[in-house]
């Protein structure tokens, strides 16, 4: 069911799980039928546990399908609530890096583009600002 793709787990304790999401993999299940990070991790936790029942696991933030990087998951409702508050209070820092082709006009700066979402296909693409 989960295929051969491995998702590296960077940190795990009783409350949190941090993994390295591969680029091209959705965080949650969608209509594509592809394996998603959340299902993979729930399977991993189910295999580790000593009881029956589905383990609690929820993503506390999102990364788009084309993006790879670290993902934080809460393993308890209490951890999910605390992390949600931290995000709302801007105490949760995210840092993005990008690979670009060609030469940039400046070494440093802010480069902005708009995202166009297609609700029918559940896809998003960059359009020039």
Where are these regions (language model features)?
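RNA pseudouridine synthases
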Residues: 1-129
């Amino acid at each position: 069911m989960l295929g051969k793709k491995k998702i590296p787990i960077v940190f795990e304790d009783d409350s949190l799980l941090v993994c390295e999401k591969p680029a091209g993999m959705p965080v949650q299940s969608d209509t594509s039928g592809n394996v998603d990070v959340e299902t993979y991790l729930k399977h991993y936790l189910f295999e580790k546990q000593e009881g029956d029942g589905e383990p609690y696991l929820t993503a506390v933030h999102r990364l788009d399908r084309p993006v790879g990087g670290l993902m934080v998951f809460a393993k308890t409702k209490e951890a999910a609530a605390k992390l949600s508050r931290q995000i709302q209070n801007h105490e949760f820092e995210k840092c993005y890096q990008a690979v670009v082709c060609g030469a940039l006009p400046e070494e440093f700066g802010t480069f902005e583009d708009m995202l166009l979402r297609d609700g029918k296909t559940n896809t998003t693409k960059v359009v020039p600002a």
